Design a protein with these regions (language model features):
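Cytosolic regulatory and coupling regions of membrane transport/channel systems
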Residues: 1-36, 40, 143-156, 160-334, ...
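Pore- and pathway-forming membrane helices of multi-pass small-molecule/ion transporters and channels
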Residues: 3-13, 28-69, 76-84, 101-144, ...
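Short, amphipathic, aromatic/basic-enriched membrane-interface segments that mark the entry/exit
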Residues: 15-27, 43-46, 66-76, 94-96, ...
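Membrane-interfacial segments
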Residues: 45, 93, 97, 118-119, ...
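Alpha-helical transmembrane segments of multi-pass membrane proteins
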Residues: 56-57, 79-83, 317, 335-342, ...
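Membrane-helix interface segments
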Residues: 97-98, 144-145, 380-383, 529
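Core alpha-helical transmembrane segments of integral membrane proteins
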Residues: 295-389
Length: 592
């Protein structure tokens, strides 16, 4: 009884918690400037009705907002294409309601899987997916391709262009922020507190590697590959030169931090070994994003995080859309939005449940606000102003308190609809409440039914993948190929998986604390092993060693001895001891 009260109290405190978010107001303003610019321009040219219809296109212009210019440009090009495909799906299938749930479910699976597999970053694929559901609603209300597609395309292009202009004012801002974070993390690891425990050092080491890896990811993705003078555009050359100088400075800072990280790792892994000159290996340091083929291939494995999130979201969308076709009220689009807002996030079950409850409360209050606004009978341009204010407010509040943000999300989403008259607004408000309940009941059901087996699957799959990633690195050591491009890619993939392993365990442990409580021992053993192998790579360079083949074979035997990935429990103490036994076979650095 006491445990139940404690859990209920903890749940209630999460509902009313107001999180500090320094800089959220400014970041929200930077984010919404492109959207508001597109909304105003399209409304001025084609009228407020078309401006509001194209809002999801403008929202798509926020994609890749934390990426450097080159990366963001690629993301925006891809989002623009899939946004048009998404709306085509919604419009085309609005006349075939039987096919709509399956189509929305499949499309949700594809988009969420690819987005998470490739780590495309915030704000996620929600706007692209909602575009399909909303387009089906617009088409059912009598709108045509000519009403919807041009407005969406124009809004997207204007918002994307404005967002690129905004980011080019300070093009290295994302990279500078990442490098600064990496340097701070490395400094904490290299100069720990005097009373730091081995567990503290392990945590600092993982955080430092995570930050350095992420910074190389952003930096290498953002570097322009060639001198654009060949294009004959002087302004582009000046921009490229300014960015290149800043980029080189950031690269030098990050390289220095990375060498400090590796030197510290070497000293901690092999304290009795003679120190190596890490600067001799600087050309092998840069890492970054693993190849997209690798990311997609590993994400297709049973129990991978992108696959689990995509399956959960697709199931929720399918069930909600089918339910809305069966019940005698409402339309699928709002229920689909309610599901996606909850289940497409990579949160714990408890956090997603809290988010669902906050969504119901926020939607209910937001509908009252929407009805109050409609009583005033706002003009089309007043609606544009309300949308702009609601958009900024919800973006500023989402990091702080999702329930309050949901009030403005609801107002924002409903003001966009082409509705006039108090009676029609009341009808829509009642329908939205019903659809929200259907969507969030579905979301909670999917979270606790489909996601119940997820923690064990995720953890077992990730640690198997992490151990397997050591094998190519060991084969490179055996053949003296560590300093080749292929060797660097294998090492990069190994570090990526080591980081993912700790992240997956941290994210899933709150959902299954009893089952996963001892997996931290496995995490410690695997990360110690992996980082010691990495230290050997730095020390040995291109010298071949025969012992690496034996270590790789031992890992293969370990993986073969484990049962296939499933929700079947595995004794973590046994896995830990097996990993440590292989780890102890690594020779001391002096014996290399």
């Amino acid at each position: 009884m006491t445990d139940a009260r404690t859990r209920l109290s903890r749940f209630g405190s999460k509902l009313i918690t107001f999180h500090p978010a320094p800089g959220a107001n400014v970041n929200a303003l930077i984010d919404v400037i492109p959207v508001i610019a597109a909304l105003v321009l399209v409304s001025a040219i084609h009228g407020p009705r078309h401006g509001l219809i194209g809002m999801l296109g403008a929202m798509g212009g926020l994609s890749g907002k934390q990426s450097p210019p080159r990366t963001r440009l690629r993301i925006l090009l891809g989002v623009g294409v899939v946004l048009m495909i998404s709306q085509t799906i919604g419009i085309s299938l609005s006349s075939f309601p039987v096919l709509l749930p399956a189509a929305l479910g499949i499309w949700s699976f594809v988009m969420i899987f690819v987005w998470n597999a490739l780590h495309l970053g915030p704000p996620g694929p929600l706007n692209v997916l909602f575009a399909a559901a909303l387009a089906s609603y617009y088409a059912a209300e009598g709108m045509t391709y000519a009403d919807i597609m041009p407005a969406t395309a124009a809004s997207f292009l204007l918002a994307a262009a404005t967002s690129m202009i905004v980011i080019l004012v300070n093009p290295v801002r994302p990279a500078r922020r990442a490098v600064s974070k990496a340097m701070e993390a490395v400094d904490l690891y290299a100069n720990p507190e005097q009373d730091a425990t081995p567990a503290d050092l392990a945590r600092l080491r993982s955080e430092a590697h995570n930050s350095v890896h992420a910074a190389w990811w952003i930096l290498n993705d953002g570097v322009w590959p060639q001198d654009p003078r060949a294009l004959g555009r002087p302004w582009m050359y000046r921009l490229w030169k300014r960015m290149s100088m800043a980029w080189e400075g950031l690269r030098a800072d990050l390289l220095s931090a990375h060498i400090t990280l590796t030197t510290t790792l070497h000293a901690q892994s092999f304290p009795s070994a003679e120190a190596s000159d890490m600067r001799a290996n600087v050309r092998y340091t840069p890492m970054g994003r693993p190849p997209w083929r690798y990311l997609l291939r590993t994400s297709l494995e049973r129990g991978s995080r992108p696959l689990m999130v995509a399956l959960r979201a697709a199931t929720g969308v399918l069930v909600a859309a089918v339910a809305m076709e069966i019940v005698p009220f409402g339309r699928p689009y709002w229920a689909v939005l309610s599901v996606l807002i909850i289940v497409q996030m990579d949160f714990t079950r408890a956090d997603m449940t809290v988010r669902a409850v906050l969504r119901v409360i926020g939607t209910s209050i937001g509908l009252q606000g929407y009805l109050a606004i409609m009583l005033v009978q706002p003009t089309p341009w007043m609606r544009i102003g309300i949308v702009a204010v609601a958009l900024w407010t919800m973006n500023a509040l989402i990091p702080r308190q999702y329930g309050i943000a949901s009030i403005f999300i609801t107002i924002f989403a409903l003001i966009m609809l082409p509705i006039s008259g108090e009676q029609q607004a009341l009808t829509v408000a009642v329908a939205r409440i019903e659809e929200t309940v259907v969507g969030l009941v579905t979301a909670i059901g999917v979270i606790h039914v489909v996601g119940k087996r997820a923690p064990v699957l995720l953890v077992r799959s990730q640690y198997r993948r992490t151990l397997r990633s050591l094998m190519p690195v060991l084969r490179d050591l055996e053949s003296g190929m560590s300093t080749t491009v292929t060797g660097m890619e294998h090492r990069n993939e190994m570090v990526h998986e080591l980081i993912q392993a700790s992240a997956v365990l941290s994210a899933t442990r709150p959902d299954s604390p009893e089952i996963l409580k001892n997996w931290s021992l496995v995490d410690r053993a695997v990360t110690e092993f992996g980082y010691d192998v990495l230290a050997h790579c730095w020390h040995l360079g291109d010298r071949p060693v025969r012992w690496a083949r034996r270590i790789s074979a031992e890992i293969a035997l370990l993986l073969a001895s484990l049962p296939p990935v499933s929700d079947q429990r595995v004794d973590p103490a046994r896995v830990k001891s097996m990993v440590e036994e292989i780890h102890h076979q690594l020779p001391p650095m002096k014996a290399c």
